[in-house]
């Protein structure tokens, strides 16, 4: 799992697998 910006804004960090 990698924590990265999953939003267009790139201001939010979510859990992306």
UniProtKB/Swiss-Prot annotation:
Name listed for the protein in its UniProt record: Hirudin-1A
Function, as annotated: Hirudin is a potent thrombin-specific protease inhibitor. It forms a stable non-covalent complex with alpha-thrombin, thereby abolishing its ability to cleave fibrinogen.
One Pfam family here: Hirudin
GO molecular function terms listed in the Swiss-Prot or TrEMBL record: serine-type endopeptidase inhibitor activity
Organism of derivation: Hirudo medicinalis
Start and end residues of each stretch annotated as Interaction with thrombin active site: 1-3
Entry keywords, A to Z: Protease inhibitor, Secreted, Serine protease inhibitor, Sulfation
Gene Ontology, cellular component aspect: extracellular region
InterPro entries linked to this entry: Hirudin (IPR024793), Hirudin/antistatin (IPR011061), Prot_inh_hirudin (IPR000429)
Post-translational modification: Sulfated.
Compartment(s): Secreted
